[in-house]
């Protein structure tokens, strides 16, 4: 799961994990401590490498450039959220407003909302300028080797989720015959 800041990656990753039963690992929860402080970079890289050695996962977040490209190479499925630039800015702003009342999805507890949001505005522009062209090239190159989903609108994201539900024998509601799984709870991330 990758794309620019404020594109709904954490929400989509959570829904995918719920539907498929795959374990979810939000990188922000691995890369940052409660309150927003970063873990040492080597510690993050070790935990990230341990995640990639697992058989199945949904990983949400960016991490750092080298770990992102390692993750893309290891994944059997790539989900790229590529929304219009203004949508990313708007959704970052909505996240700031909602974050006044509850921690945003995928964020460490007690993260500083204001400074994190200001950083997200900067990241949206930098990602759009530097990474978006590389991401688009990646999905074009990998389309024949991996399952690639290039989602360019909220409607395409909803259609993708619906297709995943159907593929997993689910409709709008959870299949009662399938045991409920709590990704990230039933399976803990590797030790740091």
How would you name each of these model-derived features?
Residues 19-25:
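Post-Walker A helix-loop "phosphate-sensing" segment adjacent to the P-loop in P-loop NTPases
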Residues 25-77:
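Conserved nucleotide-sensing/catalytic segment adjacent to the nucleotide-binding pocket
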Residues 2:
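Residues at the beta-strand->loop junction immediately N-terminal to the Walker
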Residues 12:
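Hydrophobic positions on the alpha1 helix immediately C-terminal to the Walker A/P-loop
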Residues 9:
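Conserved lysine of the Walker
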Residues 5:
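The conserved Walker
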Residues 19, 123-192:
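NTP-dependent small-molecule kinase module
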Residues 83-131, 171:
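A glycine- and Lys/Arg-enriched "phosphate-lid" helix/loop adjacent to the NTP-binding pocket
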């Amino acid at each position: 799961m990758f794309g620019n800041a404020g594109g709904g990656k954490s929400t989509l990753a959570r829904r995918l994990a719920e539907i498929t039963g795959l374990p979810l690992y939000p990188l922000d929860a691995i890369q940052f401590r409660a309150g927003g402080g970063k873990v040492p970079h080597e510690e993050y890289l070790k935990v990230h490498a341990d995640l990639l050695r697992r058989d199945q996962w949904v990983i949400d977040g960016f991490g750092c450039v080298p770990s992102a490209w390692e993750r893309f190479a290891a994944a059997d499925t790539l989900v790229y959220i590529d929304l219009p630039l203004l949508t990313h800015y708007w959704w970052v702003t909505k996240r700031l407003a909602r974050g006044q009342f509850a921690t945003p999805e995928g964020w460490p507890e007690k993260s500083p909302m204001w400074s994190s949001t200001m950083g997200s505005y900067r990241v949206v522009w930098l990602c759009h300028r530097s990474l978006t062209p590389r991401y688009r090239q990646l999905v074009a190159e990998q389309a024949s080797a991996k399952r690639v989903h290039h989602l360019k609108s909220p409607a395409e994201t909803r259609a993708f989720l619906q297709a995943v539900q159907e593929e997993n024998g689910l409709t709008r509601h959870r299949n009662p015959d399938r045991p409920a799984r709590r990704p990230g709870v039933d399976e803990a991330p590797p030790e740091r």
